[in-house]
Regions:
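Mature catalytic domains of secreted/periplasmic carbohydrate-active enzymes
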Residues: 1-435
Length: 435
């Protein structure tokens, strides 16, 4: 990882936890953000959603406050998704929120809300556009018209599309103040790298926003990292990898074994955009543990919400974030600024580490005392509960005498007895070692 990327991503690798917001016209049919493609809808089929779009409850301040209460440090909004509809006031298209019943620039209000609450500002932009006449259609495996023979011999001017796409990105990086993160989406097949005139694009972005961090999807996607982890990453390889709906088994490292920045993007249920029949929500416990897993492997987690057509985040998502927030309020020090521990993963949970501070994330109730693998008894000064600072009892007893190379702690008075964990989601212990 070069020094420029290291400097740019310092805040990102410190903050660790963000909110993704997928919101657009697709919230009206309420069956996910890919509805136009899955149902092979024409632009004309999709047009009624543009006419209907009227987010009367849109209040980005509520969204951002919810993110902040959950312990999230940055928020990324879909300024434009694959359907081509813009939440911002682009001068290059009429297909935008200002021409709907909303009648205003929804991105402007979002970035203002983030800054007001002190959160980092991120914008997602789809480099794919299913509504643009010069984007490839027939035979493109993602496009709604991929099977429509009417487009088989269509003549398009792809450079005209690229001029348009670059122009819209330039609007975002020049009209909305300092941006902290740009999330491009996505490359596939031969639609990658210089197909997007990616070098030209990155140079333009860096001219206006030299410190913005950028994902790797001008070259890769959720199924590959592109050249970011190679000996010679390309100029458009990005500042961080973006695994989707999966946590890399060993984190993400370059060819020399050095960890590089990465971010898991994950949904709360099984859709990014609002889906009124998808109630398969992950539990707060699971999501907390997945965040910890990401941090323990040197990564971030950006967790998605999909507001409905009126602009309301589903109540299930709100409740989950509130529960995560309760845990984060007490245990945030084991997340922010933390990363890979020098200790191996224990069978009862995970370790995270920040400098010499080691945090044990305990998921399973131990039978008797809890072994702190990798820590010798004579090196341990004390262990405290991170949630309240109280002392955790030492757990060495007659039945641990054989295991002299491992320190033990107990969750109750008698180290031989079994006690319930104080926090069944994740009990965090702060381990203080002797200097």
């Amino acid at each position: 990882m070069n020094q420029e990327i290291r400097e740019r991503t310092k805040w990102f690798m410190n903050d660790r936890f963000g909110m993704f917001i997928h919101w657009g016209l697709y919230s009206i049919p309420a069956c996910g953000e890919w509805v136009m493609s899955f149902k092979e809808m024409t632009v004309e089929d999709y047009r009624p959603y543009f006419e209907q779009f009227d987010p009367v409850d849109y209040d980005p301040k509520k969204w951002v406050r919810l993110a902040k209460e959950a312990g999230m440090k940055y928020v990324v909004l879909t300024a434009k998704h694959h359907d081509g509809f813009c939440l911002f006031d682009s001068k290059l298209t009429e297909y935008k929120a200002t021409n709907t019943k909303a009648g205003r620039d929804l991105v402007r209000e979002f970035v203002d809300a983030c800054r007001e609450e002190g959160l980092k500002v991120g914008l997602y932009f789809s480099i794919i556009d299913w509504s643009h006449p010069d984007f490839p259609k027939y035979g493109d495996r993602q496009h709604p018209m991929r099977n429509n023979l009417a487009y088989k011999d269509e003549q398009i001017n792809f450079d005209r599309y690229l001029d348009f796409m670059h122009g819209q990105i330039e609007e975002l990086v020049t009209n909305y103040g300092k941006l902290d993160l740009l999330w491009f989406d996505f490359s596939y097949d031969n639609m990658t790298g210089e197909t997007w005139r990616a070098t030209e694009l990155i140079k333009m972005v860096r001219k206006h926003q030299p410190d913005v961090i950028i994902d790797n999807r001008l070259e890769g996607a959720g199924d590959n990292h592109g050249s970011i982890a190679t000996e010679h990453p390309l100029i458009y390889s990005g500042d961080f990898a973006s695994p989707e709906q999966i946590i890399p088994p060993h984190g993400v490292c370059d060819v020399n074994g050095e960890p590089i920045p990465w971010e898991l993007c994950a949904t709360m249920n099984n859709h990014w955009g609002y889906c009124n029949f998808d109630h398969q929500y992950k539990t707060p416990q699971m999501l907390i543990r997945k965040l910890v897993e990401c941090v323990s492997k040197g990564g971030n987690m950006i967790l998605n919400v999909g507001p409905d057509a009126k602009g309301n985040i589903p109540e299930e998502s709100v409740k989950i974030l509130q529960e995560i927030g309760k845990w984060m309020k007490k245990n945030k020090d084991s997340i922010y600024g933390c990363g890979i521990s020098r200790l191996e993963k224990p069978d009862w949970g995970r370790y995270t580490q920040k400098g010499n501070a080691i945090y044990a994330h305990v998921y399973e109730t131990p039978l008797g005392a809890l072994p702190l693998y990798g820590i010798a008894p004579d090196k341990l000064e004390r262990v405290t509960y991170l949630a309240d600072g109280s002392i955790v009892n030492r757990g060495e007893a007659w039945n641990t005498a054989l295991y002299t190379d491992v320190a033990f702690v107990s969750f109750g008075e008698d180290p031989v007895f079994t006690y319930p964990l104080p926090d069944e989601k994740d009990t965090v212990l702060e381990i203080h070692l002797k200097e």
